[in-house]
């Protein structure tokens, strides 16, 4: 398994209480693929550097996880299919 960091920017029109269940829904893909979710850090609403889909703000969430590459690819695919997700970025942090 490899370590990944996933950043998700969600639609700011989502209610605060809808953010956690949405993230958990995405994380079920990781858990079903025998991956481990190490940390979920929701930053809340932040101003975007530029508008995405005509939205000046987004709800940021950063997820640290360990999973196989195929599982992370499926997670990214699921996120991109969801209309509440403005942008995703999957990174493999450097080992120090």
Swiss-Prot record:
Keywords: Ribonucleoprotein, Ribosomal protein, RNA-binding, rRNA-binding. PROSITE patterns: RIBOSOMAL_S6. One of its GO terms (cellular component) is ribonucleoprotein complex. Pfam families: Ribosomal_S6 (PF01250). InterPro entries: Ribosomal_bS6, Ribosomal_bS6_CS, Ribosomal_bS6_sf, Ribosomal_S6_plastid/chlpt, Transl_elong_EF1B/ribsomal_bS6. CDD domains: bS6 (cd00473). GO terms for biological process: translation. One of its GO terms (molecular function) is structural constituent of ribosome. Binds together with bS18 to 16S ribosomal RNA. NCBIfam families: S6. Belongs to the bacterial ribosomal protein bS6 family. This is Small ribosomal subunit protein bS6. It comes from Streptomyces griseus subsp. griseus (strain JCM 4626 / CBS 651.72 / NBRC 13350 / KCC S-0626 / ISP 5235). The lineage of its organism: Bacteria, Bacillati, Actinomycetota, Actinomycetes, Kitasatosporales. The gene is rpsF.
């Amino acid at each position: 398994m490899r370590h990944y960091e996933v950043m998700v920017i969600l639609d700011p029109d989502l209610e605060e209480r809808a953010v956690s269940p949405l993230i958990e829904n995405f994380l079920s893909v990781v858990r079903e693929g025998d991956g481990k979710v190490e940390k979920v850090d929701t930053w809340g609403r932040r101003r975007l550097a530029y508008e995405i889909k005509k939205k000046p703000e987004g709800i940021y969430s950063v997820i640290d996880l360990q999973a196989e590459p195929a599982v992370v690819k499926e997670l990214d695919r699921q996120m991109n299919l969801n209309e509440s997700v403005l942008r995703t970025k999957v990174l493999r942090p450097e080992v120090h």
